């Protein structure tokens, strides 16, 4: 966070990481079926739509990063991943600006983009148990945060996030 000079950048990055937790991107058991960098970009496209008025750091991936790809708002990680995968395979002709942006991102060092190689359920039995315990604790914390939030503020939470929280509470 040292390189994030403004409070707005810091808040945006913390919100970004919290949203990855809320959407449970790091607990995906199928994560090994995806190309890691494309998965990360698709996950960032999902969460960065919910940052609001906070300023993401320069170079953050948003829908505007891929101007001629026809990305729609509020789609799933899988939907964005599929679009990015197609772009990577044959996008130079159909979406040249987006293809150039993706090539640039794919060439960046992991440290700059964030290393999510540890995401996904570990293959060992102990790792799986630890992952389940961590996810259960995360669920508890999300529900507790919702319960501590005065009802008058619930309307300020985006509908998609409210739905995720409602599903957690029901389960």
Task: Label every PLM stretch briefly.
Residues 1-4, 25-33:
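Glycine-/proline-rich flexible loop or hinge segments
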Residues 2, 18, 43-53, 171:
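An amphipathic, basic-hydrophobic helix/alpha-beta surface used to engage anionic
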Residues 21, 25-30, 54, 58:
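Amphipathic alpha-helical interaction segments
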Residues 49-171:
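Negatively charged
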